[in-house]
């Protein structure tokens, strides 16, 4: 893509959960492994070192049986902001094209507004595929949070 034409993805959702719970759900493997991934996907493995400079790696099996693995490095981890790189692994475990994700958490009374911003897509179809995946993931996330309340 030409410089300056990087398609970005921005999604905003409000959840009936306190920010502290939403933060833990994004930064603790025991929680993230229960919701991260689109509907129909199950977590195969989830490792997270949620601190600036720490790494994560999450493998999930799709409904077709294929395992999809993503990994990255945290750039920032604070109660109101989580920023990390995001890359899919190929069959040999090598990282693919790297993107950047920033999660912002805003307290609204007893609710939390989550804004997800992802940049660095190679093309618009890649962004659109991620939009669909994240939207499905946020449905699972909402159900996970509701079960914790």
Q: Residue locations for each model-derived region?
A:
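Hydrophobic/basic alpha-helical segments enriched in Actinobacteria
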Residues: 8-11, 20, 45-46, 64, ...
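A conserved amphipathic terminal alpha-helix motif
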Residues: 113, 120-149
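Hydrophobic pocket/interface hotspot
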Residues: 22-25, 32, 56, 74, ...
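Structural motif
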Residues: 5, 16, 77-78, 108-110
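Short, hydrophobic/aromatic-enriched beta-strand segments in well-ordered soluble domains
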Residues: 13, 116-118
């Amino acid at each position: 893509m030409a410089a300056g034409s990087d398609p970005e993805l921005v999604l905003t959702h409000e959840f009936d959960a306190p920010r502290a719970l939403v933060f833990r759900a994004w930064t603790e493997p025991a929680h993230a492994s229960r919701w991260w991934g689109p509907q129909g996907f199950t977590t195969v493995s989830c490792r997270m070192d949620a601190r600036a400079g720490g790494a994560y790696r999450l493998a999930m099996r799709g409904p077709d049986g294929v395992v999809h693995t993503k990994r990255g490095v945290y750039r920032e981890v604070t109660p109101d902001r989580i920023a990390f790189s995001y890359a899919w692994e190929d069959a040999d475990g090598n990282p693919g094209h790297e993107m950047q994700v920033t999660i912002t958490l805003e307290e609204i009374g007893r609710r939390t507004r989550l804004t997800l911003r992802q940049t660095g897509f190679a093309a618009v179809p890649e962004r659109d595929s991620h939009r669909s995946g994240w939207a499905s993931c946020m449905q699972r996330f909402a159900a996970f949070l509701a079960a914790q309340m």
